[in-house]
A protein has these predicted regions:
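C-terminal transmembrane beta-barrel domains of outer membrane proteins
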Residues: 17-24, 69-72, 89-189
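Gram-negative/organellar outer-membrane beta-barrel architecture
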Residues: 1-92, 156-179
Length: 189
């Protein structure tokens, strides 16, 4: 069970309450490669107050304030980092396909990530470059569910910015996210 609050800096105007279960299995297929497969059940309730972003309001009006999704996932990763917690050399690659073919919320997602860790000056420093792409689309006549929107900003995305603070906003400054995210960043340590 999870709850997500609005990413608006002006007011809390919506909340997502998600309950469900999922299971994912990862199977190594080579020294650095792993394949993942998973399935789950999610029920998401949207609680709203005044000032709701139009996309959220319209989604709730069209499909109700409660949606059920049956997410299926398939993924692959390649991890040649020399240390998974504090790497100084190597690469990490990930590709993931998500599909919810049944339930109220029907959608497909695709996400990918590439990281490279480059040792510098006799391994005293490391340069990390990172690229991430996330995309989602509704299936059939259904729009992409607003509770699956992508956000940027914060730890793991763009540091020095508040979590979810980058991206589209409505006239009230409410962060609504979107169905596409591109993140390119680097770190030197």
């Amino acid at each position: 069970y999870t709850t997500s609050k609005s990413l608006s800096s002006f007011a809390e105007v919506y909340e997502f309450a998600r309950e469900g279960a999922s299971i994912t299995f990862g199977v190594p297929i080579a020294e650095f490669d792993r394949v993942f497969i998973g399935a789950g059940y999610e029920r998401t309730r949207i609680t709203t107050t005044k000032g709701v972003p139009p996309t959220f309001y319209n989604f709730g009006e069209r499909f109700g304030r409660s949606s059920v999704a049956i997410p299926l996932t398939l993924g692959w990763s390649n991890d040649s980092r020399n240390n998974p917690l504090s790497p100084t050399a190597g690469e990490f690659k990930r590709l993931s396909l998500g599909l919810s073919p049944a339930g109220d919320a029907r959608y497909v997602t695709l996400s990918t990530q590439y990281q490279r860790f480059i040792p510098l000056w006799s391994n005293k420093f490391t340069l990390m470059v990172n690229g991430e792409l996330g995309w989602g689309e509704g299936l059939g006549s259904r729009p992409y569910p607003v509770f699956k929107n992508f956000y940027a900003g914060g730890l793991g995305s763009v540091r020095a910015f508040e979590g979810g603070s980058l991206g589209p906003t409505d006239n009230f400054g409410t962060r609504s996210g979107g169905n596409l995210r591109l993140n390119l960043n680097s770190e030197f340590y």
